[in-house]
Design a protein with these regions (language model features):
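Alpha-helical transmembrane segments
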Residues: 11-19, 73-92
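A generic, lipid-embedded transmembrane alpha helix
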Residues: 47-70
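Central hydrophobic cores of alpha-helical transmembrane segments
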Residues: 51-52, 173-185
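Membrane-proximal helix-loop-helix units in multi-pass membrane proteins
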Residues: 83-153
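Juxtamembrane boundary at the C-terminal end of a transmembrane helix
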Residues: 186-196
Length: 196
């Protein structure tokens, strides 16, 4: 009997581990939103912050769904497993930055977000690179599904992250989160058809 697990045995294990990390990120976002509803006057709300929370919630769900393509992976290594868990952790960190434990030292969520934007957009820029590596790991069949828009998202996303990292202008940040959300909706509509 061969004690080495098969790819079919490793995939569910990895999906559980990644799902746990993603679930923690979703929990943080939902708890912050619930806290806003429970105590509406405790901290100042922000459209910018809420849009990023919504965008990241969608990002976590998309990540969880996209990772299902790993079932086609024939060879698993510890490096691949570590990479995938690391990628999930970066998404959790983004959720943690959007759902701080205490913002008493700040003038609401937007003030906190803009003052912590360098951390947020540095990690977000990193996720664009991680997503590219993740797509390459999944291989040819997965990669063939994409058109030019997938390959444009990385340089455009990186430029937008650099702008957001550098400037605290609210209008710029609203435009960037708007572009990010539109791209997420495009991906959702284009790739997630449930018929057939």
């Amino acid at each position: 009997m061969d004690p080495t697990p098969t790819a079919a045995e490793i995939f569910p294990h990895m999906r559980v581990v990644m799902g746990t990390v993603v679930g923690l990120g979703i929990t943080r976002l939902l708890m912050t939103f619930a806290g806003m509803i429970q105590h509406p006057h405790r901290n100042r709300w922000s459209t910018l912050h809420l849009l990023w929370m919504g965008s990241l919630l969608l990002e976590l769900i998309l990540f969880w769904w996209w990772e299902f393509a790993l079932f086609r992976l024939e060879f698993w290594t510890f490096g691949v497993a570590l990479f995938l868990i690391g990628y999930a952790i970066t998404l959790f960190l983004l959720a943690a930055l959007l759902s701080p434990d205490n913002i008493a030292d700040y003038d609401g969520y937007e003030d906190f977000f803009l003052k912590r934007r360098r951390w947020f957009f540095s990690i977000l820029a990193g996720t664009f690179v991680l997503d590219t590596v993740d797509t390459l790991i999944k291989g040819g069949r997965h990669l063939e599904r994409f058109d030019w828009s997938y390959f444009v998202q990385v340089p455009v996303g990186m430029v937008l992250c650099v702008l957001a990292w550098r400037y605290a202008d609210r209008r710029l940040h609203l435009a960037i989160v708007g572009i990010h959300l539109l791209h997420q909706f495009y991906l959702t509509i284009r790739f997630f058809t449930f018929a057939g």
